[in-house]
Amino acid sequence: VTLGRIVDLAIKDMNNMGAAMAPAAADTLRRHLMDTGRTAADYDLIISGDLGKIGHDLLLTLMMDAGVPLDAVRYVDCGMLIFSPEQDVHAGGSGCGCSASVLCGYIMRLFREKAIHRVAFMATGALLSPTFSQQGGAIPGIAHLIVLEADEA
């Protein structure tokens, strides 16, 4: 488990939660990899939920800037897994609903089928106060990470 820290990059657009949460996800993932001595390649999947397309791309950029490149095949986002690019959902899904659905439905099935053995799963969140945001306040983000592992046999 890697506990997240509140990260505030002064994102004020309450319609862009991915941009508000991606910096916290990048911070948590970077610290997790440093603390464990692992690399992104040590995981079958690295999953965020729910940054959506905008936050997903921003996380890739932030990690590259930090010298920890991720590939877009190994790193996936729950909102992007639930919705296809053809659907008009704009940035993503519903946050905790996306994370829970993907983890319990899709990821656990991959573990049962022995298709994956180690996953870094990051739940992301925005510390959003609609009133504060409407008054021009920033939206800090946070992300916590757990590693799920199964025997390879």
Regions found by a protein language model. Give the residues of each.
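Glycine-rich beta-alpha junction loops
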Residues: 3-7, 47-53, 125-126
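Short glycine/threonine-rich loop-to-helix capping motif typified by GTGT followed
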Residues: 51-66, 131-138
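Conserved catalytic cysteine-centered active-site region
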Residues: 65-102
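Short, solvent-exposed loop/turn segments at secondary-structure junctions
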Residues: 119, 128-130
